[in-house]
Amino acid sequence: MLTGTLQMMGYEFFFTFNEERLSLIPKEEEKDEIRYAWFHTKIGTAIFAWPGNPKFVEEDFLYGRANETNRVITFLTNKHTQLQENNGIITVPILAYFFSYSDRPRISRISFSGLELNYIYPINRTFEISYKPEEHDGKINISTYDFDSTTTEEQKFNVFGKEVQVYFGVTRTTSLSIEKPPLTLSSSMIFHFEETQDYSFVRELYRIAKEFIQFLCNRRNVSFTDIRLSNNQGKVGEFNVIEESIEIEMKPLKDGRYIQQKYIAGYEGKILDDIAEKNLYLRHLGKSFRDSRIIDAASFVLRTAAFEWEFSRLFSEDEWKSEQRKILEEEASKELERLIKNSTGKLKKIYKDLKKSVVSYFSLSQKISQTFEEYGVTILDKFGSYLYKLNNISYNHSEIAERIGKQRNNFAHGNLDKEFINESLLDVVFLEQIVLAMQLQYFGIDEVETKKIINKVFCYNLIV
C-alpha cells in the first residue's frame, strides 16, 4: 500500500494506492463541498438530490508523490468510467501507472520482456558454453555473444502519425547475490521514438506490443513480466498496466506453438503498422491455448469472420467477375436509379432495396474455394491432406467450402432445427490455419516461410 498526495480537478487529496485501486481522501473542510458538487444534483437553495449525474475524471494523467519512496507516481486515468464515492472517499479508475524521479518525465524508449519473448527471440542462441570434460576440474565457461550479434535490425512503423523503431535484443543481468543466479538472460522487444510526455501514446504502444505477441503466439493470454521506460538521459521507471490476471501456459511454448522472430525478420514493421491501425483481425484467437481447442457457435462464426476480413484485404471480388457481368450490373443499377427518381412511397423503397442487391457478392463458400485455388497447391494442401487423412475425412476443397458456408449460416441465422454438420468441426479447425496463412501472405512473407510457420504453430512436424 502506497500513500501520498496529488491534485485532481482543482482539489488536493491524500491518496492510497494498492497497485489496483486508487482512493482519494479530500481535506476535511472540503469533503462536503466536493461530495455535493460532484455526486449530487442541486434542485433548490441548499437542496440536493442523490445520486447526481455521473462524474468522470477530467485529467488524462494524475501526478502524485509517494510518501514511502519520495518518488513521483504518474497515473493514467480511465476517463470513460465514472468516479465512485463512499463516505467521502473517492475511487478513481486508472489504466496504468509508473514511478519516476522527476515530474512529467519525457519518454523515448519502452522495452518489453516476458516469458513468450524468451521463446520468440530465443535466449539459448545468445551464448556459448565451453569446458574440458577430460580434465575433470569443474571449470565451465559461459560466454555471451556481443550486443551487435544478438540485436536485430531496426524496423519502422507508425502510431498516430509518429514513427517508431522496433528491434529485438537480449538483456544481460549479473548478480553476486546468493538468492539470484550469477547471470540472467532475457529477450526484449524495444520501441524507440521521439521524446514525448504523452503517456497515452506510451499506453497505445503497450496495446500494440501485446497484440503483436498475441498474433505470434496465436492466443490471447500472453503477458510481459517487465516493461521499462527510459529517455535520452537514462532509465525512467517501470510501466504497470491495470488489467485482469491471466492464465500462464507453458505447454504451447514447450510444444513450439508460436512464431519465432527469424521467420518474420524484416516484416515486423509491416505487422505492427497493421496492428496500430487495428487492421489485423485477432478477435478469433482463443483466450488461451486450451480455450482455442473448444469449438462452439461463437468461435465458429468468429473464425469465418476472420477469414472474410482477411479475404477482403487480399482479393478484390471484381477480379473474378466477367466483364459482361460488370456491364450488366452497371446497366441494372442505372435503370433502377431512374425508377427510384420517378417513384414515391413504398414503391421507391422497394426499388432502393432492389438496387442494393444488383451487385453480386461472393458467398463464404465461394471465397473459401477461391482461396484454395490461390494457395491450395503452394501452401495449404500439404497440411490439409495430412490433417483430413488423419481424421479419415476426404480432403476436397469444394466440399470443405460448402460445409463451412452452410454451418456458418445455420449458426448466424439461428437455424436450430438444422442438424450440425459433423465434418465442419474439422473444417473450421483447418480454417484457423488458412486465416494465419492469409495474414502471412498479406504481409509479404514468402510461401516457404509461411509453411514453416504453419508447421510450427500447429505442430504438424512435417518436412517442409
Feature annotation, model-predicted:
Residues R21, R35, R65, R71, ...:
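Arginine residue identity/basic-tract feature
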Residues G4, G10, G44, G52, ...:
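Residue-identity detector for glycine
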Residues M1-L216:
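Long, contiguous, compositionally biased segments that the model treats as domain-scale units
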Residues E247-V464:
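Amphipathic, oligomerization/interface secondary-structure segments
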Residues Y199-G269:
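Internal, Lys/Arg-enriched amphipathic helical interaction segments that engage polyanionic partners
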Residues N18, N53, N67-N70, N78, ...:
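Detector for Asparagine
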Residues I34, I47, V57, V72-I73, ...:
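Extended aliphatic helical segments
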